[in-house]
Amino acid sequence: DELDFDVPLDFNMAADFAPCESKSLGLYAVVDSTDWLEKCLQQGIKTAQLRVKNKTQDELDELIKHAVELGKQYNAQVFINDYWQLAIKHGAYGVHLGQEDLDIANLAAIKDAGLRLGLSTHGFYEMLRAHNYRPSYMAFGAIYPTTTKDMTGQIQGLEKLIKFVPLMQSYPKVAIGGIDLSRAEQVAKTGVGSVAVVRAITEADNYVEAISALQVAIRSAH
């Protein structure tokens, strides 16, 4: 059983990336536009990720520049998904990468630029692989089925999350995938420290109320 595996303690292949402001990142908004990014930051969210697809290079350049500016304006930790070169160019707070990006991204350049690095993990092996890179935070997913990505065979569930959290005590930890208001508190009760949401904000009838309710649910779990 993968959950019964002992964690090796001798990973020393990489120095640490710059740390986040806190071990508990709280409500983490993942958005696909700078309009939504600003709406979230206006409501007091302090950790967010810009995840955009299917844009031209010029559009990406402008979006990421704007996202970085918003992060500074609202004193928030804004991570750029995937586009690490543009994140470095515009002085982003951090970059979020998937496991598939680890072999192609210039991690040394990201670290030398002082950017934080968040890594996605889907299961025990990927968690250990991420640990090897000493990222600024680690994301565990998908906790529940989600419509934003095809996570067939990669649903972790609360049972695995509860096992993973204490193994990675030295990192800020983020749970992601299919989490809505009805699930946020029980996810936060695992001790994960941060709950990432996508549709729970952007598809809510009232995003202001949704953000407030999510923040209350996450805080009440601690």
Regions picked out by a protein language model, each given a short descriptive name:
Residues 23-31, 48-50, 78-80, 95-97, ...:
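Hydrophobic faces of well-ordered beta-strands that scaffold small-molecule active sites
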Residues 32-47, 90, 124-141, 145, ...:
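Alpha/beta enzyme core
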Residues 51-53, 99-107, 139-152, 184-217:
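Glycine-rich phosphate-binding active-site loops on the catalytic face of alpha/beta enzymes
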